[in-house]
């Protein structure tokens, strides 16, 4: 009964090495009317295959950079064929990045990364958000991280007001559970911001002054860290991200102008 909701889908059964355990379950499910296949070689063979693929996956990339709240993730979600690393990791790659999410472990992340990218042409120019090597608890594959360093770099800019609004829309800090989770993270900022600033943030959060709370975090924590980490970067293009629909069009135009972009037909969905 547990599997009945999945009867219309193709199921894959596996064990460690693809032996009799998974074979017998496959036969049983097939006799019960399920569409089912056995994973040849088992999970261990699958993992070797995934790791071999990730070791050499270095596609040409367009990497979106910009300060927290500028809209990078929103654009990645809207651009066809992009790779959303934060979605794969289920983490926003920041100190508050796990709020509302269930971060994945390394093996799950790598498996999902493989599923997302293995069918893409190796030379297809792809959008990705600029990240450090670590996203939450997981590490980006080394070859892909190297491709990000060598990719085309675009700097996105937006006003403080716009960034605060977008962060507020993303985190929705209005229910008690979310507020509790955010407040519980604040002590981890004492070393960077000092006790007084952290107490100020806690007070603003308790008073539901979310715009002020986010503004201070951006000015005193996120922006200085971003500027320090990106101080040596040189960008191929700078774009305003005030109007994300226009920014999306500008990005697709930039993509199409590149000498190697693999997919020549990228369209904006209306």
Task: Name what the model sees in each region.
Residues 80-147:
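Conserved nucleotide-sensing/catalytic segment adjacent to the nucleotide-binding pocket
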């Amino acid at each position: 009964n547990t599997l009945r909701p999945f009867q219309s889908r193709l199921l894959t059964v596996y064990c460690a090495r693809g032996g009799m355990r998974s074979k017998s379950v496959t036969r049983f499910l097939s006799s019960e009317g399920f569409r089912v296949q056995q994973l040849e070689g088992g999970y261990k063979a699958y993992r070797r295959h995934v790791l071999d693929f990730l070791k050499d996956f270095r596609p040409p990339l367009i990497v979106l950079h910009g300060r927290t709240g500028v809209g990078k993730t929103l654009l990645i979600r809207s651009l066809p064929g992009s790779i959303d690393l934060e979605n794969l990791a289920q983490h926003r790659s920041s100190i508050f990045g796990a709020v509302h999410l269930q971060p994945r472990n390394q093996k799950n992340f790598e498996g999902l990364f493989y599923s997302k990218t293995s069918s893409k042409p190796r030379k297809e120019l792809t959008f990705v958000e600029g990240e450090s090597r670590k996203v939450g608890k997981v590490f980006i594959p080394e070859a892909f991280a190297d491709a990000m360093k060598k990719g085309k770099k675009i700097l996105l800019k937006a006003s403080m007001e716009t960034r605060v609004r977008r962060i507020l829309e993303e985190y929705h800090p209005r229910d008690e559970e979310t507020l509790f989770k955010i407040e519980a993270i604040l002590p981890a900022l004492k070393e960077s911001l000092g006790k007084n600033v952290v107490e100020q943030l806690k007070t603003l959060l308790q008073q539901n002054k979310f715009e002020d709370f986010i503004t201070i975090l951006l000015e005193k924590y996120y922006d200085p860290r971003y500027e320090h980490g990106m101080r040596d970067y040189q960008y191929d293009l700078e774009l305003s991200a005030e109007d994300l629909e226009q920014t999306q069009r500008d990005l697709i135009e930039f993509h199409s102008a590149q000498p190697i972009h693999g997919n020549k037909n990228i369209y904006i969905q209306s």
